[in-house]
UniProtKB/Swiss-Prot annotation:
This is 5'-nucleotidase SurE. One of its GO terms (molecular function) is nucleotide binding. Its cofactor is a divalent metal cation. A divalent metal cation binds at residues 8-9, 40, 95. HAMAP family: SurE. It comes from Nitratidesulfovibrio vulgaris (strain DSM 19637 / Miyazaki F). The gene is surE. Binds 1 divalent metal cation per subunit.
């Protein structure tokens, strides 16, 4: 397969380098377009007011293009302009830190995969449940194998496969589970600190309270030692709320007389 590889931790991140080697070892043709600098938690940001510059990286058997931009910039620019061949799949990762539940709203890793899916490419986001991963060669090899095993044709159009690895050695992993996202949310707080020169600053911290995590969801299974697979799609529509909003729809904007509320008027907001 022809694989386009990106991430949000930067082109020199250990996770991307491990994924690159594993994909090559598995016989894939790999083309890297990744951020030059770390872009963690930038979400789906796109650069629109600055030029995008590209730097070539050739070192120790690694070849890739670094973009001075966001993960989404890398995907858009890479697939539109930089790559000579159309990839069969786009892989984003391996990210340092899990991307489960609400994380996907902030994740540059998942956003890169989502952008690829929007552009019509099969997309895989890969993350590891630790911010200080040591050797990710085992996880990368497993992900490369999974890439060839997945039935991409059977997945819905614009589906992103979100793959997360638990923070345990691969021999201790319990197995692989397909599962939904947790709906638990982060409990955030900011530490107020002082820098060495006496200046004041704030540092974000947070946790997903374990008691709020439903069993069988990605966060729960990952904590238990399972590899998790979650299909994602970009559709923020709250379909359950459509009927409520439909009550105030109608023709014109001269009041609620034409709204589909049984013809009643008055009692406005």
């Amino acid at each position: 397969m022809i694989v386009a590889l990106t991430n949000d931790d930067g082109i020199q991140a250990p996770g991307l380098r491990a994924m690159y080697k594993a994909l090559l070892d598995a016989g894939h043709e790999v083309h890297v377009v990744a951020p030059v600098t770390e872009q963690s938690a930038v979400g789906h940001a796109v650069t629109i007011s600055l030029p995008l510059r590209v730097k070539e990286f050739h070192e120790n058997g690694f070849r890739g293009r670094g973009v001075y931009g966001t993960p989404t910039d890398c995907v858009k620019l890479g697939l539109s302009c930089l790559l000579d061949k159309k990839p069969d799949v786009v892989v984003s990762g391996i990210n340092a830190g899990a991307n489960v539940g609400p994380d996907i709203l902030y994740s540059g890793t998942v956003s890169a995969a989502t952008e690829a899916a929007h552009m019509g490419y099969p997309a895989l986001a890969v993350s590891y449940d630790s911010f200080r991963p040591a050797d990710l060669s085992g996880q990368a090899a497993h992900a490369a194998g999974l890439l060839a095993t997945l039935d991409w044709q059977a997945l819905p159009a614009r589906c992103v496969v979100n793959l997360n690895y638990p923070a345990v050695p691969m021999p201790e992993v319990k197995g692989v589970r397909a599962c939904p996202q947790t709906r638990a949310v982060w409990k955030d707080w900011y530490d107020h600190r002082t820098d060495p020169r006496g200046g004041s600053y704030w540092w974000l911290n947070g946790v997903i309270p374990p008691e709020t995590v439903a069993p069988g969801t990605d966060r729960a299974l990952l904590t238990e030692g399972w590899i998790t697979l979650t299909p994602l799609r970009f559709d923020f529509t709250d379909h359950e709320a459509m009927d409520v909003l439909a009550r105030v729809q109608g023709d014109g904007v001269g009041g609620q007389a034409n709204a589909q509320t049984g013809g009643q008027t008055g009692g406005g907001i």
